[in-house]
Amino acid sequence: MVKVHSRTITLFLIFAVSVAAPGTSAPGAIGQGGSAGIAQTGPTIGSKARIQPLRPGFEFPRETLRFEAEYHFVTAGVATLRIERDGTQEHVTGVADSTGVVALLFHVRDRFNAYFDAQNLCSQKLIKHTEEGSHWRDTTITFDYKIKKAVLEEKNLKNGQSKRTENDIPGCVTDVVSGILYVSTLPLQKDAVYAFPLSDGGKTVTILAHVEGKEEIKTPAGTFQTIRVGPEGDYSALKNRGKVQIWYSDDSRHLPVQIQARMFWGTLTVYLAAIEK
């Protein structure tokens, strides 16, 4: 069970709450025929899942966002997220580490670099270095929209084995690191449901982001008026992770303030601990 807890820290810190693991079944995946098929209580924005281009006036935060993960009142992990302009692209850097007792029981040290187009928000490349228990890997995912393929190259750092696969993607996708920032660019209108394609390089799935309501949230970074969003997908990997909710600041920047996952073994909360220059 410790392994499940520790890996979940990494998944929720870097928005992998919204994607099936490579090789898992993903009913309703884009490019495989079908749609998410979840009952909706509000209007779905757009007739199908798509990445909406950057809306006029929106600006990404240029500070470093520092997060902490808490489980049963114990700090279980820390993470940082930063986005910087790099020519015509946005460059996202992410770090996730287990800490304290959890780190002694299960080592997590993950590093992420994601690149997406600054205007149409389509993911371009994702580079990952992951150390999770005995699984250490270097992974590069290149999104080639000319041939509509995600090219995944991965090396096992323990045994030296490498693999390369090409998997179908639609015309534009977001990835498991950029996804949380993509949602922040949306208007997040009351009761709306936003459908968009998200790829981990192996599978592309439809994510439905339900705008559930507003709430005041207090974290070490301050007190925030927030918009609560519930991401859903019609596939077992997300369902098995329980109820997931993300709170964004109710202002023009839509900063991710808190992520919470209610699992059968308890509740994991990831909260904004500091905003640093």
Language-model-derived ranges and their functions:
Residues 13-15, 29, 154, 183:
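Generic detector of low-complexity/intrinsically disordered segments
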Residues 10-21:
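Bacterial N-terminal signal peptides
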Residues 22-27:
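Ser/Thr/Pro/Gly-rich low-complexity, intrinsically disordered segments
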Residues 137-183:
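Hydrophobic, well-structured mid-protein blocks that either form specific transmembrane helices
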Residues 8-10, 35, 43, 170:
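Intrinsic structural disorder/low-complexity segments
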Residues 2-12:
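Bacterial N-terminal signal peptides that target proteins for export
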Residues 9-11, 52, 155:
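Intrinsic-disorder/low-complexity peptide segments enriched for small residues
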Residues 28-145, 182-277:
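Acidic, serine/threonine-rich low-complexity disordered tracts
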